[in-house]
Amino acid sequence: MSAMLSVKDLAVSFQTRRGEVGAVKGISFEVSKGEILGIVGESGSGKSVTSYALMRILDAGGVIKAGDATYSGIDLRRSSERDMRDIRGREISMIFQNPRAALNPIRKVGHQIEDVLRHHSRATRYDAKAKAIAALEAVKINDAEARYNAYPFELSGGMCQRIVCAIALACDPRLLIADEPTTGLDITTQKAVMDLVRDLIRERSMSSILITHDLGLAAQYCDRILVMKDGVIVEQGDPVQIFSNPQHSYSRKLVDATPRVGTDVRSLLPPEDRGDELVPVVSDRPLLEVRDLNKIYAGKSGPVHAVKGISFTINQGQCVGLVGESGCGKSTTSEILVRLMDATSGEIIFDGDDIAQVPANGFAKDGRRADIQMVFQDATDSLNPRHTSRQTIAEPLRRLGKMRGVKLTARIEELAALVGLPLSLLDRFPHQLSGGQKARVGIARAVALEPKFLILDEPTAALDVSIQAVVLNLLVDLRAKLGLSYLFVSHDLHVVRLLCDHVIVMKDGEIVEQGPSQEIMSNPQSDYTKTLLAAAPKPPARRQAN
């Protein structure tokens, strides 16, 4: 196969207040015609910077220091900016990580597709509209003419990602760069988007670079994989070979940290970090009983029944998984249980009392507030950027625990030790912490008041696999040490399989199936559960050393 893209000795640096920082350090690779190349690695590995360098859209301070990048005979590094404007979109196009950030919120999506068409093909307004609608149909958007006039905020995350795909593919580029195209999407939407991208690439005889931290996704959709660490390619090869028999220690670490069938939560960690396994004690005594819970919102076209008469029980010490696609009602259920909003009807029996009788806006002053806490999906968004880790952990202790002085300081340091946060990080702000460190701060804040029940809302969704492994093991240990009960909200069925004793599957506001985790995962009864399991990426098995 002839190379469509050839990269040789590419080096990229950023100028910072502390001096020059090398982000990409002399990497070389090729992309053949018709090939899907995966670039995998954790945050800071240089994979996204590589793609931005190829497109010549580096952030301020970024400079290509050395190397060459040649696309179909065109020198991308030395082409003029005017030439690059023609190349972007028409020859090389990009799907960005956050679809909502990539779309203009105050312009109709159809007009945003037209912009690309009119710039690159000089189409008339009439022709551009027809081609924009055709682009929407190509990415399998139903009722494309109506969606043409929609604004991004009127569409789901999966729909917005399809719009971004339509924009990227509108001018029939020959090379598509997809930068974390499924981050934040539920599992069936992720599969639909990736199947769509793969099929369009095959139909149009394109090439593609898939940038991701999800090795399972790369293994399923890529012809070849590069593994990057600290700006360097440490290994490359066939996905099955890399997954089954990784040669580099970093590749082995990533592969072992990827949840899949046949693994347990301790095996995600390197052997030297596993320690003694702590086994949670699950009681037969119910801690939380939800009975016939309903939530109805007032919508423009009539009432919206978000939660429809659901019932379930969580025992003391038990971890229950709540899974389903976006819009199934799991987040609404979580917010009702943590008393951020009121139910329309139903009972929430917590430790013998019906807390649904206490209005949500008054629950902060209720004595049971400390017993129910939440760990949020995005640790960055859930932390006050102006508060240090110490101040964040101290807040519930001051407000609800009435702690002050030496006692407060001692408790903060005790909590930091409990979640594995070095004391040296207590006086740092969120922007000075890694994703895993921010997750530890959020967990420390949640357990500060010794709650009985934690709601975990996608707590590892935005984390790299090795950091996810550490956080999952921390949650298992805390559950055993503190006797906590969890409601674990997630769309990652591999993680739910590892962590949860019991699973609840929701669809359209209803529970379609629930039962013991292993039973649900190995022998699902509902067609919907079967669909969710079929959509989950299936990484190749790891070959065990003799």
Regions found by a protein language model. Give the residues of each.
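Conserved signature/switch motifs of ABC ATPase nucleotide-binding domains
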Residues: 89, 153, 171, 449
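Short catalytic/signature loops enriched in Gly
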Residues: 3, 142-148, 239-289, 300-303, ...
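Conserved ABC ATPase "signature" region
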Residues: 75, 127-146, 354, 407-424, ...
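Conserved ABC ATPase signature
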Residues: 150-155, 159, 429-433, 437
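Conserved ABC transporter NBD signature motif
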Residues: 64-75, 346-357
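The feature captures the beta-strand-to-loop junction immediately N-terminal to the Walker
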Residues: 40-41, 323-325
